[in-house]
Structures are given as structure tokens and as C-alpha cells.
């Protein structure tokens, strides 16, 4: 085994977004455990900062609401692929989780009576779909920003140890099974360190950078997914990628669904509010997969605007400048900067943009990572946990409802912390590491400096994103996906011959981007293989050649292993103390 420095902790959190900070805080506040957070960016620059719309919770501050209505909407929104035990837990924990954030100091927008302001959001209804709910707790249109700063400050108070600008290279398995920790690199010096931990928690976020147009930050490169797959562990439901309906045309930056929740609506070239045709009941506030497909169908039918007739418009000016500046100040700024549009006077050009990864590392409601044994049974991976976008509990199924993402972060980040407070007392011990994993991580680093390698990693990344966008976008079909998989296979062969031109050791961003490319390719492969084998349309996975949902054959989770093997897990239809919501049409 290669000799590298070792740092030892009770719990190691990888990623400093909402999920990572919430998990860290739960343990650090107990003052019982040594907790470290490793992040490749400063914590308040994590991607949670870009979440605009709010966090869902059935508080009933504006109109009466119930957690069971929230649960119904989430199950239906997931196109019935969400696990109902996990969804029930999340929706019931939503109100106390929001009040907890309020007590931490998160500056929510307020109603006149001082209670938390709540706005309407797509797919959220009252009384099992009868009318729109006001469920989204908002801090203007910067809720994620406020949450991240609040949680970071509380972690500083609690004494959490931060390693920011450190990059996770690979997991280290235990010699007798389980996970012993992770190899990470100090981005400032390129020093490698083995973080040995009793519990390793992945909160590494999404991987939207596999697509050309995305709302995701440059840092969202699927690092946790790549590390898990290289460790021989599976990921789940990777065919499901949410394309947010309202990305700024040509850029991909997000216009929050809260803009439509406040009363904005989509129009075509004739100024028609076309969502009234596609979704007469919920209109512009239908589920995101429905609205995104409707926009593209409208464009293909000739309703597009602009010189290329290839996008539509989001109208907000009718709301008035006072409302816009009070409720959507960030959108005013974004639109001016990236679309050169004054939303108080004119509509915003928009087109769907890759936004969210519904799949990820399979877990239970305690955040414990799972694999599937040869008999198809769930097996807990000792010492490994996951929460947030890199995890698949699964509360989002085939399509996520807006504002359930921030809720997912805090509920399951907290759940991991609560579980570990007890598990670290008795169950979880330090494991002897597998030396081969440390050697393999070092070899992966050295591969990029082989003198005979010639391929440019930056060009390979461009070609990969182009292949994913063209062959695995909003609409899919067999021949295109087969073509896309062949393109990825050739790119992967070239990737093994890629070379760094800059081999310096100090803040070498080219080295980090090359390592990220390994992870992006792992995510792309998982997406491509999973998408090709699911012969139905469900939620965000929409196929021209299989247009209907097929519950008889496909009401199950796909579990992908790195060798291309696909296993399956049943959807959990057993909420506690109540009957499940049976699959129905979402029309």
C-alpha cells in the first residue's frame, strides 16, 4: 500500500450543501463526535445556494393544508415510482423541519401576521388534487442561499471541522467489507490524505453537467456517483433526469417555478397562454415533466418565438413592479444579466433546461446506502450513507415536485444525523482499510500524466455533453439511444488515453476537471444503459417508441452496476398506518 497521511474522524461528510451541512450539524451539536466536512468549494458556494423557489411544508399559513395531501401530490408527481414509506416520512417531517430552520435564524418572507409566507407551486394541491395549495415556504426567491448561510453559521458555532477546497478522489473499502473512508486531495497543494471514518456520508449533489444546457453549477459533476460505482456499488433510477420548464433561452440559468406560482404564465408566438390546452386544470403549475414536454411540443407544432422559432416566453410584467421586486428580486437581476430583459416590461425567452437528477445512491430513510444481493434482497453497506440529490431514497421517483428538493436535503440530512448519534455509540467502528483501494486511487491520478496519452479532456467533455443532449434528452427512442451508447463507448475508450497538459501541483483546475470527467462519464453511462432498458414512458423518461406507462412490467426501480448489469428493486407501497396511494393516470 502506498504511504499517505491519515486523518481520523467519527463521521466524514463529503459535500457542504444543504444535506451535508444539516447532517453535520445534527452530530456536531451533540458534542459527542469528531465530525469533518470535505468540500471542493467553500460551503456557501455549494449548489444549494442557487435554489430559488422555496421549501415545501404543509403549514397551512395561507390556506388549510395537511401532510397527507402533500404526500399524495408527491406520490402522484413521482408517477408512482416514489417509495411511499419514505415520502410519508418526508412530508410528515416537513413542518417541524421548517420551524427548526426558522429557529436557526433563516429569514423567511412573512405574511402580515408574522407567519411564514407560502406560495403556490407546480403539482402541489389541496384535498387530493381538487385545487391549488399554498405550500411553499419562501425567502423571496433566494431560499437556498438563505438556508446555506444559516446552516453554515450553525455548524461554525457547533465546531464542525471544515476542509474546503479538498476534492474526493475515491472511496476506500474495508478489508472485511463496508466502507473505511475516502481518499481526498488538497486542491491547493495536490497532497493526498486518507480520511478514515466510522461513517462516510455522501452529500455530493447532482450531475447536470452531463448535458449541454443545464441550470447546474460547474461543480455538479456526479463525484459521489462516480466514486460509488468505482467501489463496485450500485446506483438507482439513473434514467430519470428532470428538465426544468423555464431555463433562460440559450443560457440554461433557472427562472424559478415561483415566478409562475406568483401568477406568471407561458405564452407562444401569438401571445396565447398555451398551457390551458395541454393541462386545463393545473395549467402552468402542472408537474415539471408535463410542462417541459408541453413547451417542446408547442415549439414543434410551430408555436415557437424568435428568429429560429425555437423557444417560448414567460410573461411576468402583468404582476406589477412592486410585486416583482418584493417576491422575485433575483429573477429581475438574472433576466437583466443573462437575457437582457426587464421583466417589469417584457416577457423572458425560455426553454427547458436540465435541472435535477432523480436517481442516485439507493438508501433507506436513515440514509444508509443499499446494494442488491444475488437473491434480489436489499443489503445495507456498512459505514456508507447518502443524502440530497446524490441519493435516491426514493422520494422523487420518476419526477420531482418543485420545492421538495430543499425539503429532501434537510429531512434526510437530519435523519442521518439522528441515526448516527445512536449508531456511533454501539454499531459503527473503524474498519481496517483495503490497501488495494488506496493504490487504485493513486493510479487513477497518475494515469493523466502518462507521456504517450494524447486526447484532450476538455474536448472529450464537450463531445460527451453533446451526445447526452442529442440522444438522452427530454424525448427518447431506441435508435437514438443505441447511437448515443455507441458514442459514449468510443468516448470512454478515448478517455483512457487523455492527458493533462498542465501538471502543476498548486490549484491546478485542469487536474480537477479531468478527474470530474471520469465521474461525468460514469454518470452518462449509467443514464444511457438505464434509459435504454426501460421500455415505457414514466415521469421524466419519455419515449416516442413506448408512449404509455407500463405498471405491469415497470413499476420498479432500476439498479445499475458499473459492469452494465441491471437489477431491480420493488417500489415500496407500504406507508405506516394508512393505505397506499395506488397508481392512477396523472391526467
Curated annotation (Swiss-Prot):
Its EC number is 1.3.5.1. InterPro entries: FAD-dep_OxRdtase_2_FAD-bd, FAD/NAD-bd_sf, FRD_SDH_FAD_BS, Fum_R/Succ_DH_flav-like_C_sf, Fum_Rdtase/Succ_DH_flav-like_C, SdhA/FrdA/AprA, Succ_DH/fumarate_Rdtase_cat_sf, Succ_DH_flav_su_fwd. The modification Tele-8alpha-FAD histidine is found at residue 47. Its cofactor is FAD. It catalyses: a quinone + succinate = fumarate + a quinol. The active site is at 288 (proton acceptor). Substrate binds at residues 244, 256, 355, 400. Belongs to the FAD-dependent oxidoreductase 2 family. FRD/SDH subfamily. Keywords: Cell inner membrane, Cell membrane, Electron transport, FAD, Flavoprotein, Membrane, Oxidoreductase, Transport, Tricarboxylic acid cycle. It comes from the Bacteria. FAD binds at residues 15-20, 39-54, 223, 389, 405-406. This is Succinate dehydrogenase flavoprotein subunit. Part of an enzyme complex containing four subunits: a flavoprotein, an iron-sulfur protein, cytochrome b-556 and a hydrophobic protein. GO terms for molecular function: electron transfer activity; flavin adenine dinucleotide binding; succinate dehydrogenase (quinone) activity; succinate dehydrogenase activity. Pathway: Carbohydrate metabolism; tricarboxylic acid cycle; fumarate from succinate (bacterial route): step 1/1. One of its GO terms (biological process) is electron transport chain. It holds the Pfam family FAD_binding_2. It is found in: Cell inner membrane. One of its GO terms (cellular component) is plasma membrane. It is a peripheral membrane protein.
